[in-house]
Every structure is written in structure tokens, then in C-alpha cells.
Amino acid sequence: MTSETRTLYSQLPAIDRLLHDSAFLSLRDRYGHTQVVDLLRRMLDDARDVIRNTQTLPDWYADWAQEAKLRLENAAQSALRPVINLTGTVLHTNLGRALQAQEAIEAVTQAMRAPVTLEYDLDGAGRGHRDRALATLLCRITGAEDACIVNNNAAAVLLMLAATASGKEVVVSRGELVEIGGAFRIPDVMRQAGCTLHEVGTTNRTHAKDYRQAVNENTGLLMKVHTSNYSIEGFTKTVEEAELAEIGRELDIPVVADLGSGSLVDLSQYGLPKEPMPQQLIAAGVSLVSFSGDKLLGGPQAGIIVGKKAMIAQLQSHPLKRALRADKMTLAALEATLRLYLHPEALAEKLPTLRLLTRSEASIREQAQRLQARLAARYGDEFALEVKPCLSQIGSGSLPVDRLPSAAMTFTPHDGRGSRLEALAARWRMLPVPVIGRIYDGRLWLDMRCLEDESRFMEMMLK
């Protein structure tokens, strides 16, 4: 160690002296003695590293209290930070998928603040069932005999298979052996559920005779899986759910379906692409139908299974059901969301997912043009700002080939350097409320479809 290094080390303050500084007294009151002391020890270690590597004191040496304050504030931030989603993906899996309706938010708040009748029957003063209220609503909306709620649709598929076909074969078209995010594959789920996969047909063509020929004495289920996150086009043939249900009735084999996204309304009435609905499959005779709560339905993360009462009873009594059951906050939000579907005339206004998906290109473009001048005054020295047409996507594996006409504010660096776009995107991610866009074709795009809180957006962008 050189004499210069020793001199620099000697200038580092003692923790006890720092703790008696008035600024640190304030930090101790706010964050607690232990957190502040632990932080100061880390800061001293950091300072020693800087001295050892650079033979200089750290940049923040002159104001330890300010550096400590910044670090403590950063550490205190929630891991689930609110962001402004301008990626162009409405149901963005990495950003939490569906925004909740105000009614759902209020229902969750109430469920957290007070004891609730989660499994308590007020009429009989005894134990109730946590799925009962939602089952009643879901039966009213879908026409099913009964319903079951778990924590996500992957869990719903696992429970459906394990409870009704463990030790048996499940017949599925080869073209429907889907994989979703996180390497969740239908064949893997079947193995976990104790089922044997029996593939029929080919990737692009499966016929009714393929299902008939596959049935044997060990067949437990015929299964349809909606390919919600990809599309096979061209020379194709599939067996529709109604036809498969008829085959199931003839052969006395239950038919189950995994819809994935799942929509409880006909989206085409809003000018959106049509998606199969659970009520259609129930009417067609499918025994069990599973779908997600936090995708096109617009509620919290949940797996929903509707169908025949006897088969739902098998699910409810299976040991996996308790491991996969939804908590009171999920059930409260889902019930409030489902009640919105009882008033379909107001659904597009009250349900954020539907409200964002149905925004017109003209209204989005007008919004972008209205904000352009103020943003140009802030960023115009480095970037050319333009309002350009773009295509939003629904996201979360829903309607993968369909796009929604939209408008974006684009930022193009005057000097053409892509590094400026990366730096700008990084700067926006560091804002108190991060703004998330996407870089494409030499521009940074902010798709304005999901922008509802303009004042907060402009406050962040003009910092």
C-alpha cells in the first residue's frame, strides 16, 4: 500500500461520526437505525474499492448524506413499479397484462381491509365454498352447469387433466400441441398430470376420422387446444369443437377444451377480430372449457374452468385444487370484473382492456399530434419527432396475427446514431414512472394506444 493510498483511507469518516450528523438522524428516523448502519458499511467498502482501484476518493465523498439518501430511496422502491406502457402491446405479459377496472380495484381493497365471507355461509352460519359466488356468475354468463377457479390457466389445464384422465390417454391433434411462454408445453403438462398423450392427424390437417380411430379402451378424454398464440394457414383442416363434442357423445368420451385467452363477448361487435367464446363451446356440448382471467377477459390472473357439474365436482375434490386455488384478492377482483359483463352496454367504457383495444386510430393520432409540439421543444435539438401510423398488437398470445391500426410518436436521432436511441430509452426507463417504448427501424416508437394519463406522461417526459 502506498503512502498516498493510506492518506486517502485515513480521510474516510467513522460510522459513529456520520450517524450523529443531523442529516443522518433524519434518515435513521425514516428508514431505521439498522438499515442506515448497514448502508454506511457498504458505502465505506465502496469507497475503499474506489481508492484501491483509482487512487482517488469517490465522487460522492463530499456529501455522504445525499448519497445515502439516494441509495435508500432507490432500495425502498417497490419491485413492482408502475410504468407507462407505450410498447404497442396492450396485454403485455412482462408488464402485468390486463389493467383492472375501478370496480375490481375497489373490491380488492375491501377484501384486504376487512374479514370477508371467503368460505363462510351467512345463511347457514357454517362453512361455505370459495368458488360459489363466481360459479353462479360464470354459469349465468356462459350457460355452464358449474365452474371452478384456480390461480392461472396453466393450472386449470393441469387440474382438468389430472382430475379426469390420470392414467388414461388424452387424444389431441398434432397441430394443437402448443407451447406458451416459459416453455409450458401441452405434452409436458399431460405427463405431469399422469396422462398419456395420443397425437392424431398432422401439423396442418386433422380429420374427424383421426379422433374416431384413436379411441380405445384406455381413452380418457378428447381434447381441443385453441392455438391462440400462433396460426397455421394454407392447406389446413381442423375438427371444430361442436363436431368433436358429437364424436365424444357417440363414443361416450368427455371432450375438454383449453381456450387460452378466452373472451366472454363477441369481439367482432367492437370491430376486433373474432375469438371463440366459452359459452359457444358449452352450447356445443364440450364437457369442460378452461380460459384465462387476465387476458381478453380483462380481469386478474386466474384460471377459469366451466362445464358439466359432475366433472367440475371431480376437479373440486382433487388434491391439486387446494394447491392451485385462488386467494381472496383474486376472487374479489374476478367477481367484480365478471359483474361488468352483466351490463354489456357499458363494458367498453368500464373494462380497461376493452377500452384500450377499441380506441380508434383517429383518436390515437389526434392525441399524438396534440402532444407533439411540447415534446419537440424538449427533445428537438437531438431528435426529429414525427407522428407515424403503426400497428398495435393485443399481446399475451391473444390473436397473434391480428394487428390494430394505431399511431406513434417517433424519435429519430439527427446524427443517425443508434446509440442515441438506446441512451434515450435507458433514460426513460430511469424516470420515477418509467416510459417504455420500442426501438425499430432506426427510430424509438411510442405507440400511444395505451396512453390514458397524459398529465403523468408529460410530467415524466419533460423532466
From Swiss-Prot:
Main location: cytoplasm
Cofactor section: pyridoxal 5'-phosphate
Species in which this protein is naturally found: Salmonella typhimurium (strain LT2 / SGSC1412 / ATCC 700720)
Name of the protein described by the UniProt record: L-seryl-tRNA(Sec) selenium transferase
Localization in the cell: Cytoplasm
Family: Belongs to the SelA family.
Pfam families in the cross-refs: Se-cys_synth_N, SelA
Keywords from the UniProt entry: Cytoplasm, Protein biosynthesis, Pyridoxal phosphate, Selenium, Transferase
Assembly and interaction partners: Homodecamer; pentamer of dimers. Binds only one seryl-tRNA(Sec) per dimer.
HAMAP family associated with the record: SelA
PANTHER family, per the entry: L-SERYL-TRNA(SEC) SELENIUM TRANSFERASE (PTHR32328:SF0)
GO molecular function: L-seryl-tRNA(Sec) selenium transferase activity
Free-text function comment from the UniProt entry: Converts seryl-tRNA(Sec) to selenocysteinyl-tRNA(Sec) required for selenoprotein biosynthesis.
Reaction catalysed by this enzyme: L-seryl-tRNA(Sec) + selenophosphate + H(+) = L-selenocysteinyl-tRNA(Sec) + phosphate
